[in-house]
Amino acid sequence: MTALAARTIVRFRHLVIAGWVTLAVLAVPRAARVADVLSVEVGGVKTESERAYRLVREEFPQPIANFFAITIQGPMPIDSAPFAALLDSLTASLRREPIIARVVSYHDARDASLVSRDRRTTFFIASLGAEASKTATSHAPVVRQAVESAVARLRQARDFEIHVTGAPALDYDVRTVSLADTRRGEQRSVPLAAVVLILAFGALVAALLPLVVGVIAITCSFALVYLAAAFHPMSVFVLNIVSMIGLGVGIDYSLLMVTRFREELNRGLGARDAATRTIATAGRAVVTSGLTVVVGFAALLIIPVPETRSIALGGLLVVAVAVLLSVTLLPAGLAVLGRAIDGPRWLAHLLAWYHHPLFWEPWARWLGFHPLRALAIGGVIAAAITWPLAKLRIGLPSTGWFPSGTDAEQGARALEAIGSRGVIEPIRVVLQAPSGSRIVGSRFVRGLARLSDTIQTDPRVARVRSVVDLEPGTSSLQYAFLYSDPARARARYGDFLSAYLSEDNRTTLMDVVLTDTTSLTDAMDVVRWIRAVANGGVRGLDSVQVSVGGFVASGVDLQDDLLGRFPLLIGLIVVTTAIMLALAYRSVLVPLKAVAMNCLSVAGAFGLIVLVFQHGVGGHLFGLRGPTEAIYVVVPVLVFAVVFGLSMDYGVFLLSRIKEAFDRTGRNDQATMEGLSATASTITSAAAIMIIVFGTFSFARMLVVQLIGFGLAVAVFLDATLIRMVLAPAIMHIAGRWNWWPGVHPEDVPRAGAGRSRQEEPGDSAAGTASSTASAR
């Protein structure tokens, strides 16, 4: 921040405060409605699964592209009068809804797959019309209200357990739970963060300011996400990312600013001058730290997947807002408050021990005398933590993907009683004949039958619903005869063919329903196998275009796309970070060491994620029902991108203080001990806040949010303890004066004890921006 900008902000401090208050008030209504414009699956990528979904929606007269499954469990069989009356009442109620295109129940189709073996559980399908399918998730409350209305009219309905499930219902509940997780995480983390801030500042007023900045940053960012959703599809998980990152960096940056302001007051400056000085020094450090986080989020934009791009956009917005608040609103408020931020005085005296450097000096001194021993101990711990990473398996988690206890999840469990849970998310195989041909022509019908028979040989497949699986025991020759007269076929199987055969008879659909014992992880293997079979050439389907889609296939496409671009993302972040550090410190070893340490903290976080979630060691502490068996692909990509930026803040802080002491004394060992002891309490406070904010989301009901929250919390913990307090200073001791080569030659250093010729302003030291970070703290 320039001196002119600093003076301008302080001069017009009341206007700055009024402007931000106005923006925050205007942001509240949109922030409150942000969940309404977010989606669980944002789509939009030109993948095979997206092509299959588009064909299903566009080619069939009454597509079962989006449907609700209503489950009924009762104390009596479906043939009893009360059960039959309830089923008829529910289906009639939904048929009256304009958004419902068709309803199929056991009473309509007499399909045994719709009823459990004991005949006490059934389900029926309510399919949305083409127009309603465009906003399928938003219609879940309408369907549930129709069900509740029908239940209220029948006294005997109270003896039955009824749930609304299906993909739109699951997506709606995911969005609802995600919003609840965000609110719950904020409610838990803010009070705990307040305790850490009081401990760090020894003052109630000073502790309150960072919390205010964090809350305003989240509110304004939610409003910006609401506006951005009109131009770019936004994932529902943006809620959790904005909340986590907003609170974390907002409070962290404010901690830096308030700490510097109090230091300037203690040096005798007035409130306005102290605020101006804080902006010019700590403000520059905040901007630099913010840029390192932005680099990580910006790198995610190279991945053309709407889910990751929307998360990246949300992260960019909240970091930018947090930085702006920290360098404008916060110093303006500090200039107004002045000495009032230090109250009450007795609290500062009570907590003075926390800030005394002697508390950390014994550790710094021991590490200075035994750097090799510290490096060896730290290396063994790091190896033990990162070892599980070798067993990392990327995929859709087998358990806990959907939040437990919701209406849709309970309905999915009811489907297991029938053996039909796979109906909710079938693998959808769309086959389209060449232009001018009929997919149900005799040549293609035999190929369809071969493909269906091949798919059903896999024990993970429960059944296939298609135009060649209408009735058991029917041969391909009989199907060829049936479809030789399409009008006759539609007259006989009209309802089914309207969903599985296009009007021009060119396109058909196969729904592959998996067994209830098939996990999502194994289902991804089934998708890849079906694609291999179809692309390998099925006799009779040589000229047919095959597209495999559905929820699981979308997960396969997302994973392949992200993993294919992950090396580029890693390279971009690592190279950019290394260049920034090389320019800041004029050193070769420092950026290499910093990048290696950052990679180690990320690897350690991944190792613990694998241990706790994939293998289930201690997973019950986070509410897991069992091992997930795989880690969702978005988690390692996002954790790497975010942690690399966040951890750099602590690295720059520690290295800058060491460099400042080295420039003053010319003694590397003394500089390392001094830098470590001087920064330990601040790093501890800042990291504790981050760990609290991220850690509270480790107990969310959404598994993907748990994974991200746990990964970020663990990474910050490892970075602030094992990395910054043990390994980094140990390596600094061992490298000696070579740390600063070529900016400072090992033989060209100041004499021990030599001071500077003048009081340096931020940016004047060899460390440049990094030096300003040190002075800021």
List PLM regions with ranges.
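Structured non-transmembrane domains adjacent to transmembrane bundles in polytopic membrane proteins
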Residues: K46-F67, G74-T165, L396-G619, A630, ...
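Membrane-proximal amphipathic alpha-helices
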Residues: E41-V45
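Loop-to-helix "switch" segment enriched in basic
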Residues: V37-L38, G400
